[in-house]
Amino acid sequence: MSMTDPIADLLVRIKNAAAVGKQTVKLPSSKIKVAIAQVLKDEGYITDLRVTQTENNKAELEIVLKYFEGRPVIETLKRFSRSGLRQYRGKTELPKVLGGLGIAIISTSKGIMTDAQAREAGVGGEVLCFVA
């Protein structure tokens, strides 16, 4: 079965798993999903990520969620740019999430990074999602 929006699938799986208190999330892996998960790990929103091979040679991404005092660290996870309406922003138009308390994940020509890293690198790109 083909997936229309794999990034939205990743975000929804993380959001649903955190809502019910699961420790890990397993989903089909891709380069962009691993890159987004790596940004979440670098920013402290998740504990760990692993890419493993299943029996039928498919790559599987396992994300270990992070909790603080019994509550998920990720409170808000929202897809911004979507397959039907891509949202591109220049380096001066990159959004700040919750006045700088959250992050926006941006797909740039230099890879996937946070809004702060994109501003520092002086590049714009597609605003994939918001995390807070």
Swiss-Prot record:
GO biological process, one term: translation
Gene3D superfamilies reported in the protein's UniProt record: 3.30.1370.30, 3.30.1490.10
Signal peptide: none
Keywords of the record: Ribonucleoprotein, Ribosomal protein, RNA-binding, rRNA-binding
Name of a matching Pfam family: Ribosomal_S8
The keyword rRNA-binding appears for this protein: yes
NCBIfam families: PRK00136.1
Function: One of the primary rRNA binding proteins, it binds directly to 16S rRNA central domain where it helps coordinate assembly of the platform of the 30S subunit.
Matching HAMAP family: Ribosomal_uS8_B (MF_01302_B)
Family of this protein: Belongs to the universal ribosomal protein uS8 family.
Assembly notes: Part of the 30S ribosomal subunit. Contacts proteins S5 and S12.
Protein name (record): Small ribosomal subunit protein uS8
Organism classification: Bacteria, Pseudomonadati, Pseudomonadota, Gammaproteobacteria, Lysobacterales
